[in-house]
Amino acid sequence: MHLSSSLLFTSALLAGGINASPATNAYRRQGADMRTIIGDTTPVLSNTTAVHFPGSGDFFSVTERWDVYRPPSYQAAITPTTEADIVSLVKMAKQHNIPFLATGGRHGYGTSLGKCQEGLAIDLSHFKDVKIDKQRETVTIGPGVVFADVFPVVSDAGYQVQTGTCSCVGMIGATIGAGIGRLDGVHGLVIDALESVRMITANGDIVEASKTKNPELFWGIRGAGANFGIITQATYKMHKSMGDIISFDLIYEPEQNVTLFNTVANMYLPPGLTVETIMSYNQTTEKPTIIVSSTYAGGSEAEARRWMQPLLRLNPWYKDIKAIPWKRMSKETALGLDKEVCANSQVFDIYGVNLRRHDANTWVKTFNKLAKFWNEQPAAQSSSVVLETWPNQAVVAVPDSETAYPWRDATTYVMIQMRWDAPGNPVETVADAMGRELRNDFAKTSGYNGLTVYVNYAHGDETPEQMYGRNKLHRLAKLKKQYDPSSVFGFHNPLPTSYP
């Protein structure tokens, strides 16, 4: 969940790039003028495809990002309206060595995306179809679809499907990094619902991947999918609706931090219960605060209250408990801050950490460091730390070998969000240093052998092993070499083409 100025919220987007060494250097295109190249390509594009250059009316609207911390930059943006047009654009970019990002929700924030400079934006916002197949109990979507588009269509058909937490994130982009969310314990990761994809490769070929078609590619897509191509269609298995979600929004005094963190760290979570703990600064009370946003799926409010007793008996000073339809879960949980969180052009300097061990002392130390930081750096008081403690019963029920995603045993995903008002604020240096320090603290007591990170929460400075897992990298590198040997799709937490 990414937090806004007072609080909140999650994920990665479908992205690609062209770079011989994307992990180390920003790539700027050199050679023929991009306007000329695009002009030469335009005759093969459909007449509904739109081309935008900086200064034109729609250029900003099709390139504006959620996070403006170390962003990519573009010489042009193109909004294709057919799959064939996307193929033509990929071939054009590869032929002329043009770096590009193919964007859906434009919600990705890893700093590796910022290595794409003066490139091409392939805006996939036209591809917004959400189609239900009740007979097969599936939903098929395009790359322009965000979670907010999926909720009402799936819910009104009588189903639910795994999603992320924030409504404005691109569903396919979040999926291909694994996709974590509030139904993890019941149904598993979002990739566990994925049945098939249709993808354009670096050569401009269209391939399909599933457990029966190109199964090795399908394995890699489920956890590292941004590295292999542009997904133009994805189909997911739906689940019969479990009814309303029970939501708990609780706020605690800062003095309760030791008791609260020990309670959360030692609390049993049944499959339907999630606990999100948010350390933030309250601008109204002018003091640190701790927010807990919990949800319970698959049971009654009375049942949910029984499971939540360890937290309720701590007597939070604010308490809002209610049943909400699943389709409004993103918008009405976590104090209803989804709209504020989803505002574009904000600064989010994000660091992520996986935990499989809950060390309450580390959480207490983090809160105390933040309290001191907020007091000394008022320009960064919108910074926060979010701990998403999701039950993982259904996640670990899927064999580790089934997908490329390596961290199924994680029990909490930490998102450290360092924030300030606008790019260029001098507080950036000290805020970024604090983010790194907190990440290191969590990693030391995480229960893993060093830092590991859910790739959708990666900052961009992590090693491939820390994102993709040492035991998965040899197989992933072989796939990368097979489908994208020149790293055309190399700006979103890129894979190597050989390992070790």
Swiss-Prot record:
Molecular-function GO term, any one: FAD binding
Family designation: Belongs to the oxygen-dependent FAD-linked oxidoreductase family.
Biological function: FAD-linked oxidoreductase; part of the gene cluster that mediates the biosynthesis of sordarial, a salicylic aldehyde structurally related to the phytotoxin pyriculol. The most interesting aspect of this pathway is formation of an aromatic product from the highly reducing polyketide synthase srdA. SrdA synthesizes a reduced polyketide chain from one molecule of acetyl-CoA and five molecules of malonyl-CoA. The polyketide chain is then reductively released as an aldehyde.
Induction section of the entry: Expression is up-regulated during sexual development. Expression is also up-regulated during confrontation with the arthropod fungivore Drosophila melanogaster.
InterPro entries per the UniProt record, alphabetical: BBE, FAD-bd_PCMH, FAD-bd_PCMH-like_sf, FAD-bd_PCMH_sub2, FAD-linked_Oxidoreductase, Oxid_FAD_bind_N
Superkingdom of origin: Eukaryota
Segment forming the signal sequence: 1-20
Documented EC number(s): 1.1.1.-
Key words, A-Z: FAD, Flavoprotein, Glycoprotein, Oxidoreductase, Signal
PROSITE patterns according to UniProt: FAD_PCMH
UniProt-annotated glycosylation sites, renumbered to this chain: 47, 257, 282
Class of this enzyme: oxidoreductase
Domain FAD-binding PCMH-type span(s) in chain numbering: 69-241
Organism: Neurospora crassa (strain ATCC 24698 / 74-OR23-1A / CBS 708.71 / DSM 1257 / FGSC 987)
Protein name per its UniProtKB record: FAD-linked oxidoreductase srdI
Named cofactor requirement(s): FAD
